Structure formats: C-alpha cells, structure tokens
Design a protein with these regions (language model features):
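C-terminal subdomain of alpha/beta-hydrolase-fold enzymes, centered on the catalytic histidine
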Residues: 34-178
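A catalytic-pocket lid/entrance helix-loop region that shapes and gates access to the active site
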Residues: 1-45
Length: 178
C-alpha cells in the first residue's frame, strides 16, 4: 500500500473498498503519522502554544479535518464545538500533546502489522475509520478474535462520537471471558 501498488488479487468488494480507503490515506493523509514517527521532537512546540496544539489537532489529517469541519458547518450528528474545545483543553492541561505521539515513534516500523497478539481481541469496525478493517482482515491479524461488530456510522473518533457503541462492544465482546 505504501508504495502505491495495486490491490492484491482475490479481495472481495468490502476488502477492495477498504484497500482503496487505506491507499488514499497512505498517499494523502499520513503526513502527521510520519512526523510523529520519524521526528517527534519537532512537535514540542505543541507544549508551548495552545493555538499551535489546536491547529495540530484540528487539521493534522484529512479525516480528522472532515470530522471536525462538519461541526463548524452546522452538522447535527457527531462531535460538537464544545467537544472539540474540551478535547484540546484536555491535551493542553495534561500536557499530553507530545507524549501522545510516542505511540507512532515506538511503532513506526510495525504500526499496521500486528504480530504476536495472543490475547482475546474485540474489534469495533466503523465505516469512516482511517484504516477500515473488514472482518476477514481482523481474523487474519488477530487469531484470538472473539468479537467483531461492524457499525453503521462512526469514524476515527468513534469512542468520542459513539461512546455507547464502544462500551456495548467491549461488554458484549468480553462477556464470554467472565
């Protein structure tokens, strides 16, 4: 995908759509992840300026921008302006704008290649996620997948936009382990 190659043979329609979505993200929306993965110290400015932090959060990739922009366009579903300000405030007051990028630095060589996950896994799939995960992909990536739920709406901020769906999936998914 990162090299811009064609989809592998044998993908079903859902997998083709997911592949196209991920390919688009790799070509047009991965800049912020590359910055955090390769040069995280350049982001220390986020600790110095609440406006800089807000700009980074609001406009650091295409899908984030889409999710946030619809708030300011008057969309009634999803996030609110207060949600956005609350999130920026949480990052600012806890000084986690930079430390949150450590995930990218520490996983820069294997971010999209989960290996060795030998614990029970629950997957909540949302249609507008940056990297959609068809059930077949989840099953291949996580041999101990115990629950998979595909939702009709939600995106990269699903836990923020659809918190009850996440709670329900976690409860339903891990109930069998009690």
């Amino acid at each position: 995908i990162a090299a811009g190659g064609p989809p592998p043979p044998g993908l079903d329609d859902e997998e083709k759509r997911a592949f196209e979505h991920v390919s688009f993200f790799y070509k047009h929306g991965l800049g912020y992840a590359q910055e955090m993965g390769n040069r995280p110290q350049t982001l220390y400015a986020l600790e110095d300026s609440p406006i800089g932090l807000a700009a980074w959060i609001v406009d650091h990739d295409i899908w984030t921008y889409k999710q946030i922009a619809r708030v300011f366009d008057g969309a009634e579903e999803g996030l609110t302006k207060d949600d956005i300000v609350d999130n920026i405030t949480l990052y600012w007051l806890t000084k986690t704008g930079v430390s949150s990028s450590r995930l990218y630095w520490e996983n820069k060589n294997a971010f999209f290649a989960p290996k060795g996950v030998n614990i029970p896994v629950v997957v909540s799939a949302f249609p507008e996620e940056i990297c959609p995960i068809p059930r077949k992909w989840a099953e291949r990536a996580y041999p101990k997948l115990i629950y998979y739920q595909k939702h009709p709406e939600g995106a990269h901020f699903a836990a923020w936009e659809q918190p009850q769906a996440i709670v329900d999936d976690l409860r339903d998914g891990f109930r069998s382990l009690r």
